[in-house]
């Protein structure tokens, strides 16, 4: 098969060379509009090519670890190499990895390569570490007893992922601090450049200040997002979505519609009051999303007890009904009610696969969904469910440890963010007040010409910066914590309310403290001959 990596690299290099040559020609001939169009098109094409190339994983991730655990679990039963590949190929939740295994199966069945040769061919189209995994899996696929190979491979990859996750958490901690530092520095960049307008008489500096500050914040957020592990917490069954998720989807359009009255309030009463209205609107969907996420986290915390209990009981009886009745006596927290429903279903004759699938849908947990699927596949191939339960339970415990470490780091970033957000708003409000003061007092000095600060631009720029920092801060907190994307709406709502309150408080403080003094100073400077 053609090497996708080499093809993509060649396309990227070709686009870069052509765009540089065409851009130089247009620049020399003075066709600046054409230059902008060509660079925009080239940038879009490069972005799409990089996006396609990014789909080929180049580092260890959660899906790869789960894939190996899945193969190791079902290898405890009577299974052939063809079936090992088929199970992974049919599990579309593995994304790109599932596509590769589908290619292996297609080469082996339709073109007569055989599983081992097909695996070798497909390995050449991937990147490490997945490429290395496929090369080593050739030994497992050529063996009559692949369990030993897969045990070593899954345990090794789990340890590597553990090390990667620890390093990623340290990177999140460091980059979170750097992001917080730059968010405060960005405001001072704007303030210094705006004040320079008075002495340089170049109003265009104001635009440059907001451009630099916003660009720095966006770059820092992208850098943080690049190092964050892409864990999946939520699983949504399209046919049977959980009630908490349905509530969230119901109130989300209402919150989005409330941005219209928030804009009207901003026009009539002022921007800070519009922020308060918009923040209050986003609190409701954010609250439902946060409660939904906490429910899933609670389910995950009790799931290791459930899966180990099911494995212990079904290893001897092979009856899901008896296993669930036994596990119901254990302390399962938020899983208890879900398990009672599962027990009621299995009592009236619902089959095991349907029962556990419905349990996964109601739990809305990706961990529960994948572990239940592995458990069912292992059961269908006659695996030792006692061992399978231990494997899946231990993997869930490791995932919980990772989540708690990540949450501890995220809390530090969260505290810093909620502290810096109002400070940023206060400084921008002071900047607006000082700009108006300079315009009204310093421009009347006869022996020196002072520049006029464009206060209208500053007002719009401040609103833009507050909205940008609010959104980026909320997304940064979401990336640091992981979890459900809807929880970022709660952060947006809280930060908008905090920003509006800080703006109102800063305006009141400036008017109360310096309003009279600045008014008298303005009268004095106006009387200077």
Task: Go through each PLM region and give its residues.
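Short juxtamembrane and helix-loop transition motifs at transmembrane-helix boundaries
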Residues: 1-6, 172-174, 233-244, 450-457
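Juxtamembrane/interface alpha-helical elements of multi-pass membrane proteins
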Residues: 30-122, 248-361, 369-378, 383-406, ...
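Hydrophobic alpha-helical transmembrane segments
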Residues: 114-135, 148-164, 221-226, 354-374, ...
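Short, charged cytosolic
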Residues: 138-159, 380-395
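Juxtamembrane boundary at the C-terminal end of a transmembrane helix
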Residues: 504-529
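Bilayer-spanning, highly hydrophobic alpha-helical transmembrane segments
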Residues: 12-45, 163-224, 402-479, 488-505
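Hydrophobic alpha-helical transmembrane segments in multi-pass integral membrane proteins
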Residues: 261-263, 318, 501-512
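Juxtamembrane helix-loop transition segments at the membrane interface in multi-pass membrane proteins
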Residues: 48-62, 224-247, 293-304, 438-445, ...
């Amino acid at each position: 098969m053609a090497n996708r990596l080499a093809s993509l690299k060649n396309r990227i290099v070709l686009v870069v060379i052509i765009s540089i040559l065409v851009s130089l020609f247009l620049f020399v001939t003075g066709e600046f509009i054409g230059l902008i169009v060509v660079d925009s098109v080239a940038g879009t094409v490069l972005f799409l090519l990089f996006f396609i190339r990014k789909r080929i994983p180049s580092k260890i991730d959660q899906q790869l670890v789960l894939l190996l655990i899945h193969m190791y679990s079902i290898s405890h039963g009577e299974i052939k190499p063809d079936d090992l590949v088929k199970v992974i190929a049919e599990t579309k939740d593995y994304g790109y990895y599932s596509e590769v295994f589908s290619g292996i199966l297609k080469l082996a069945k339709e073109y007569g390569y055989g599983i081992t040769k097909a695996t070798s061919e497909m390995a050449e189209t991937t990147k490490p570490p997945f490429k290395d995994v496929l090369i080593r899996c050739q030994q497992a696929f050529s063996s009559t007893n692949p369990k030993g190979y897969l045990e070593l491979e899954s345990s090794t990859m789990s340890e590597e992922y553990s090390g990667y996750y620890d390093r990623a958490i340290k990177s999140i901690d460091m980059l979170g601090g750097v992001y917080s530092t730059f968010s405060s520095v960005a405001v001072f960049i704007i303030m210094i450049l705006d004040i320079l307008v008075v002495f340089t008489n170049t109003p265009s500096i104001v635009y440059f200040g907001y451009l630099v500050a916003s660009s720095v914040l966006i770059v820092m957020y992208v850098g943080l997002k690049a190092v964050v592990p892409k864990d999946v917490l939520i699983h949504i069954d399209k046919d049977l979505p959980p009630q908490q998720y349905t509530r969230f989807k119901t109130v989300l359009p209402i919150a989005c519609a409330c941005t219209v009255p928030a804009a009207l309030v901003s026009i009539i009463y002022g921007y800070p009051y519009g922020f308060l209205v918009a923040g209050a609107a986003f609190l409701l969907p954010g609250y439902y999303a946060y409660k939904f996420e906490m429910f899933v986290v609670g389910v995950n915390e009790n799931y290791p007890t459930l899966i180990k209990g099911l494995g212990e009981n079904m290893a001897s009886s092979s009856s899901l009904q008896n296993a669930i009745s036994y596990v119901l006596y254990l302390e399962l927290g938020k899983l208890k009610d879900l398990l009672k429903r599962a027990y009621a279903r299995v009592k009236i004759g619902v089959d095991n696969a349907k029962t556990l699938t419905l349990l996964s849908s109601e739990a809305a947990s990706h961990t529960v969904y994948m572990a239940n699927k592995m458990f069912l596949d292992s059961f269908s191939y006659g695996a030792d469910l006692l061992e399978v339960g231990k494997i899946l339970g231990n993997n869930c415990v490791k995932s919980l440890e990772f989540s708690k470490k990540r949450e501890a780091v995220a809390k530090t970033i969260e505290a810093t963010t909620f502290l810096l957000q109002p400070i940023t708003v206060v400084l921008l409000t002071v900047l607006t007040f000082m700009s108006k003061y300079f315009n009204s007092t310093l421009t009347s000095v006869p022996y020196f010409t002072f520049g006029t600060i464009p206060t209208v631009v500053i007002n719009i720029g401040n609103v833009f910066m507050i909205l940008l920092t609010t959104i980026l801060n909320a997304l940064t907190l979401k990336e640091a914590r992981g979890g459900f994307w809807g929880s970022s709406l709660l952060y947006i709502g809280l930060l908008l309310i905090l920003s509006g309150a800080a703006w109102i408080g800063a305006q009141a403080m400036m008017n109360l403290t310096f309003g009279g003094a600045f008014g008298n100073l303005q009268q004095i400077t106006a009387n200077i001959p």
